[in-house]
Amino acid sequence: MTTSIGTDTSVAVFGYGIEGRSAVSWLRRLGCRQARLISSERPADLERNIAWIAADDLDGALSGVELLIKSPGIKPSHPLILAAMAAGIPTTSATALFVERADTAGLAVIGVTGSKGKSTTATLIAKTLEAASIPTVLVGNIGRCALDVVEDVVSHRPVIVVELSSYQTHDLTIGPSVAVITRLFPEHLDWHGGIEPYYASKLKIAATQCEGDVTIWNATDPELARRAPFGPARHVPYGLGPAAFSDTHMKLRGPHNRLNARAALCAASIFGALPSHLEGVLAAFPGLPHRIEDLGIFCGLRWINDSIATAPEAAVAALDAFGGEVKTYIGGGTDRGFDFAPLARALVSRDLPNVILLPPGGPSLLAALVALDPKAGARARVVSDLAEAVALAARLAPRGSTVLFSPASPSYGVFKNFEERGDMFRMLVQGL
């Protein structure tokens, strides 16, 4: 059922980030006269016909509100969200509203989620469909904001590819016609309140589908295999048996990216794309920034920027992608209580001469290394910041080898996000 919003519906938008701005703009285009913004400060660019209320004014913020649209980063446990629930005010998100409207219009929506791999997979799907001359639009975290294009897609009816974070799948009430789930491992536990709530939010992409829909899932992922089926749709596993395409000229590196390519073909082929279309994309697409991104040769060393790796499992995948080329590893960041044992095993098995660790989480990875192999722990060094890590790697790494920056942790309090962290790493490397 589509959420009804009329010109006189009292709608509050909570948060003024990228999606919040998009929601405010969309409400204005709808002609909604009762829209208000709830945020910590009044934005300087807020239109005068949009009322503003401080987020800490719980009573005033929700007074008379019939629908609350929240930004994806706002936790379900936020006092204002809890107050809205207690008052019986429906809460949704810009992405959920977009998927609802696409469904009502009978549009094909491919939703892509997963603890890692969703951005690359969504991009591969969109590029493969485009290679097959199938009208396509990519929206979400790596494309345009979904509500920014809702009128265009209803009018022109392309296949819609939307990348969905766990924050966005959490609010879905209607699932996409095709759901793609890449991997499942612990992430964002502070936001979701634990592993199982996080997994449940991720899998909501399938739980909200209908019987006529399709769920494409990675059969090599143990957490997904343990939980399948995830909803009423037809389930299509990928990853087992031979691939239906050639990866001979594939620019993306690593077994995980070959799995992403399999997922992309499964989804794109539903709409008529062929293996040859994917093969052409794989031969030309080098990958997205901050995802095992090759920065080139500096000081006789190849530098790889994998700032997207905010969990140990992602760093292990990056190590697997480069095999014996990596002789120096840089990792660490915010300590979220992750189990670093799998990453420590991956580092010890490669017998790397240089492991450089960043605070505050670096010591936790160091402890995991020491527990496995005291000699490996003795070779690891904890530095003060990223600049020191890059300088030390440039001095210690064997010439002709590869330096991998794959933090296995977020960087709260130091960088705004993984993009800013990756940009800083790139700048430091290019300044050597």
Each predicted region: which residue ranges?
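C-terminal helical cap/extension that packs against the catalytic core
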Residues: 46-48, 341-401
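Short internal beta-strands
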Residues: 34-40, 215-219, 328-331, 351-361
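Short, conserved loop/helix-junction motifs that constitute active-site signature segments
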Residues: 172-175, 205-212, 228-231, 321-323, ...
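N-terminal leader/targeting and accessory segments in enzymes
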Residues: 1-93, 97
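Residue-level signal for inorganic ion chemistry
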Residues: 27, 68, 112, 141, ...
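Active-site regions of enzymes building and remodeling cell-envelope glycoconjugates
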Residues: 47-57, 88-89, 107, 178, ...
